Structures are given as C-alpha cells and as structure tokens.
Amino acid sequence: MVVFGEDVQAKIRANNRNWDARAPIHARSRFYGIGDRDPMSWFAPFEWRDLGRLDGREVVHLQCHLGVETMAFALKGARVTGLDFSCVCVREAQRVAREAGLTIDYVHADVYGAVEALGAERFDIVYTGKGALCYLPDLTEWAQTTARLLKPGGFLYLVEFHPLLNALGPIQRPGETRDLVIRRDYLGGRGAVERDSTHTYTDGPALASDTLHYEWSHGVGEVVTALAEAGFSLGRLTETCLLPWQRWPAMVRTQHGWWTMSPSEPRFPLIYGLKASKPTRLK
C-alpha cells in the first residue's frame, strides 16, 4: 500500500471529513432521489453493453458513496461489494440497501488499501468512476491496486467525467455571455486544487463544517498510461455527450432520461467509459 507524504495525507483526511459531512445531506437530497429513482437510471445505455451479463459475477464498486449505482449490480444478479473511505457514506449505503431489500457487502476502506481490506484476485469486475478519480492523487498506484483486485481474465470498467467537463466553468461571470469557457485545468501535474464551499453538487442544506476539500486533475492520457503500465489490455473506449443530470441550462433531457447539450450547441464529450482487462496469464 502506498504511503503518501504528510501534505497529501492531510488533503486526503480533509476530503474524508468533507465526505462524512456530505453523506447525510446527499442521502436525503432530491438529486439522488433515494427510494424514488431507479438505480438503473444512473447508467448510460452503453455501460450495460460493455459490462455484459452480471448474474453470479463478483463485482466491486470502488468509491461507491451512497451505493445508488452499487444497487443496480445487485439487481442484475451480481454478488456485490461496495468500498468507500467515508464511514458515514458506508453507513448510509448500508441503510439504503437494507431498506431496498438488497444484499450488498459494504466495506469502509481507502482505495489504496482495497487489496488489504478485500483480498487479492477476488473479483470478476471492478467498477468505478463518475467523480471518483479526482479524489485520487496517484493513478499509478490506483491502477496497480485495481489489477491486484481482479481475477485473471477479469476487467476494470471505468466510467468517468471527461476532463473537459471538469475544465469547463459552470458559472457565468458578470458581463460574460452564456458560452462555456475553460476555467480549470484539463491536464494534471500541478498538484491538488483546493475548494471550499458550504454547498455541494446536490440540493439540501449547507454543510455545517468540514467544507474544505481537494481535487486532482487527470487527463485521459494519464489514465490510459497508468492502466497500460499496470498490465491491463485496453479495450473499448467510449466518449459520450450525455450526463445523468443537468449541468448547464442549455442541456435538454434525452429519451433515456439523461441530459445532453441542445441540438443548436456543439457536441463535445462529457463522460467517457473505458474497459480494461487483466490478462489471463502474465507475460
């Protein structure tokens, strides 16, 4: 397990406290709609194509938060484990699964300690993404950890917000047009970005404390290189102009229930999906 310097460890601890504070608010937000929104609705259509049949397969969802997506794997017949570094998130996820009548094993652990917490070569599929990688300072260690979790022949399925989405500013400044502009780094390499806000991406009350958190930018090239160097065979890469919520006013709802830019706007990637397989035999 990687050991970070004190500066990075302090940032990870701040993130942990921040997500502990967020969890109860998120669990009761209209954004997540727990108890009302179908867990399947959090997935783009191409995800089920790429994931294939899940019945009886061992699936782990890393950085699972409240488990809204984790539940969908259980509904598909998989034997599911969810892992998150926030003990409050894990507690809320356990409650949500219990109320839904689903059997899911939730584990409180950091991603970098996942092998120690869960065991090596245990899973057929590792699933993660949609706001996960930006909280990881080291993708090389993440990719190696993911490879160790998988059985030979298993695969990682990463569905993550495109770095272009994170680089585009969602807020119009005074005197500006409504055109989207680049406000943040697309590429990584300049360290963590500090953010301090009393509100998160959901509706609900303000955070009473622990508003400070840190994010790391990771370009697609950095992700692909980390996985290739960890021994993965890279398969399908999908870019899509879809999002599971309305990020900007110019977005319109699709037939699937997700959101995309209106037809009069340029098309650009908002989410990407990457399937990477662990070889059956190491070379």
Can you say where each PLM-predicted feature lies in the sequence?
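N-terminal, positively charged/glycine-rich alpha-helical extensions of SAM-dependent methyltransferases
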Residues: 1-37
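Class I SAM-dependent methyltransferase SAM/SAH-binding core
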Residues: 57-116
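A short acidic, Gly/Pro-enriched loop at the edge of an enzyme's catalytic core
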Residues: 116-126
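A short glycine-rich, Lys/Arg-flanked "PGG" loop and its adjoining helix->strand segment in the class I
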Residues: 140-155
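Conserved class I S-adenosyl-L-methionine
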Residues: 155-200
